């Protein structure tokens, strides 16, 4: 707890708080969110569309304009060819300038076959470093980023 500073309650009563920085509607910057649905529902494509939009691409999803910034997308389940298909489909709807903005702001690093494990210090630390300076980090899919039993409340 030495690195965590307590909130000065009297100061909080007196001073107006800074505005909240939302990465996505109702998702404050610096927090963790999850996109959950059955397999094959399109979560990976939705995550890629969100990543592209936040990386500087056009508004492609309901919710309007979102603050932009660098994004890292780490797919650990789909092979690079599947990601290429998704990017090709997305690119068909983008102008040359929009394609360049997405290419400049979005890093996609496929991890299929790497067996990432966020419970292992070297992976956890590596992911923390990869997230630094990024507006959004996508881990696709969480199940591929650990070896724990996902229905166990302790590790999860």
Give residue spans per PLM region.
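Post-Walker A helix-loop "phosphate-sensing" segment adjacent to the P-loop in P-loop NTPases
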Residues: 53-68
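N-terminal pre-Walker A segment at the start of P-loop NTPase domains
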Residues: 2-22
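Pre-Walker A adenine-sensing motif
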Residues: 17-28, 60-61
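Conserved glycine(s) of the Walker
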Residues: 42
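Hydrophobic positions on the alpha1 helix immediately C-terminal to the Walker A/P-loop
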Residues: 46, 50
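Conserved inter-motif catalytic segment of the P-loop NTP-binding fold
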Residues: 4, 10, 39, 66-153
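Hydrophobic anchor at the beta1->P-loop junction of P-loop NTPases
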Residues: 35
